[in-house]
Amino acid sequence: MYRVLAKHDRPAPGGTGPSWWSFIGHTTDSLWSVDLFRCESIVLRTYWVLVVMDQFTRRLVGVGVHCGAITGVDVCRMFNAAIHGQGTQRHLSTDHDPLFEAHRWKANLRILEIDEIKTVPYVPLSHPFVERLIGTMRREFLDQVLFWNARDLERKLAEFQVYYNAARSHASLDGHTPLTFAGGHTMAPANLNHVRWVSHCRDLVQLPTAA
């Protein structure tokens, strides 16, 4: 069926209507996206990172960390740690990773009363925002720092989360940060005659700001 649709079912280009993804995630915290990626410590131990982001504001909601092989139980623990203190949302988008098909994962979502929305099979571009966030975390942060263990990784990712949500502007948000976009704040014109530099992520990132 997939091969037949991929070959013959080609939608006409130039559609102007919103996608179902945009329709569901049109307000803050109405749709969160979740995905996993892997990284290595300074002693070459493998760590898995679960990322939760808000679709509408691009806000990094939280992360969960696990060392070594991962199971459905571990994914539940990581997800619960990532959203701790954040409340819950109605919808959650995940891909077709077998870890997101595990019985414990499904049961955890039922307990939290969260509706799971699956991406299109074999189409990575159907999960673009969280994939881009993971790429940003790798390029701008994890590729530039070293970490020793899970606690060290969690601490450094928490610093990146503060920077990403409060200081890093996004072109798709018209230059806003996720926090200012969520709050509906207007961007005042900057006085470029008085500029100071603010460091983030332990001086890894330096951003100019109006003094």
Model-derived features: positions:
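Charged DNA-binding/catalytic regions of mobile-element recombinases
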Residues: 1-211
